[in-house]
Amino acid sequence: NQTSPLILSFGVSDPVGAIGIQADLATFSAFGCHGLSVTTGLLISDTARVEDVQAVDPDWVSDQARVLLEDMSVSAIKIGALGSVENVTAIAEIISDYPNVPLILDPFISALPEQGMDDEDILTAVRQLLIPQTTLLVLSPVELERLAETWRDADPDDTLQNDVDYLVALGCEYVLVTGMPAD
C-alpha cells in the first residue's frame, strides 16, 4: 500500500541531475512524496551547460503516462521541459482527462538550448494547450519575457504584472515569478 502522495513528473533526463526528472524525484522524496516519471527528452549536458536535447517520441510519452495513471492515483502532476510540440500536445491531452489533479508547470524555458522555430512553436503550444489547465506556473522573469513574445511585440509599456495578468486570464490559477526582473 502506498502511503506517501504520488506525484507524476514529465521532464527531461539530465545526466547531471540538476534539472529534469532526476531533480524532481529527489525533491519529491525530500518532501515525503513518491515520484513517478515520464521522460520527455534526453539531454547532453555537463555542469556548465546543456549542449543538446533529443525529444522522446510523443507516443512513448503518452503511453508511459497512461500506464502509470491507469495504475496509480496521483496527488499532483508536475511538467518540466517538454522537448517538442508533439510532446506538448500529447501531455495536454493526457492532463485534460485529470482536471481535478493539481498541475504544476515549470517548463525550464531558459535552461535548454534554443531550437529555432521549434522553440517558438513549443512556447506557443505551451501557452495555448497547457497554461489554461495549469494550477501553478513557475517562471523566471527571463522565461516569462520569452513566453510573452508569443503573444505580444516588445513594448516598453508592457510590464511583468501585465504578462502575469494575461496568463491568469488564460486560465492559469497562480503564477510564481522567481528571482529578480532582468531590468
Regions found by a protein language model. Name each.
Residues E86, A111-G116, E145-L147, D183:
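Short, well-ordered, mixed-charge alpha-helical segments that flank or form enzyme active sites
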Residues Q2-S9, A23-L112:
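Conserved N-terminal subdomain of the carbohydrate kinase-like
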Residues D57-W60, A111-I131:
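Conserved phosphate-binding/catalytic loop of the ribokinase/pfkB sugar-kinase fold
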Residues G11-A18:
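Short, glycine-rich nucleotide/cofactor-binding loops
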Residues E120-D183:
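Conserved phosphate/ATP/ADP-binding segment of small-molecule kinases
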Residues R49-A55, Q115-E120, T150-A154:
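Short glycine-enriched, charge-decorated loop/helix-capping segments at active-site entrances
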Residues S13, I79-G80, Q115, T178:
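Glycine- and other small-residue-rich loops at beta-strand/loop junctions that grip anionic moieties
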